[in-house]
């Protein structure tokens, strides 16, 4: 089983577990090789269920996850202590790297999973208002005369007028400054929590 990591600093793992985040974008590795880009579902049996970017008829980038695939949500072993799962793992985990770094956890030990329900490819800046909310951006209608504002966890005392502005700020903090401006192709995964 594969695992997937969501950013904890901006509360995205918790948003998935609470059902507020049901979509994620992952940058397609095209390494500047684009000429005549097309997008379609991969037809080969070995890649069935994956989205694929093609350039001049050759496969260029394949989605990491397949449609219908079940994926473990990576969490630090130490965080699982609060969910009662740590005791199940105690003798095995206490000295492992994954205790405080979820990059090193084993997928089979993770108590929460998602299932991929839809995959598509688009440019990062093509994200809709609804998709920004599905990505974990909060909508706040209680701001008095200013009207609706948008924000995300981990950014104190700041709000944005559109969900796209909030998401642009979030993706630049997660993936590096300039990510939004570079407008890369991304694999968009819709998912459901199944634990």
Briefly describe each language-model feature range.
Residues 1-195:
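Secondary-structure transition motif
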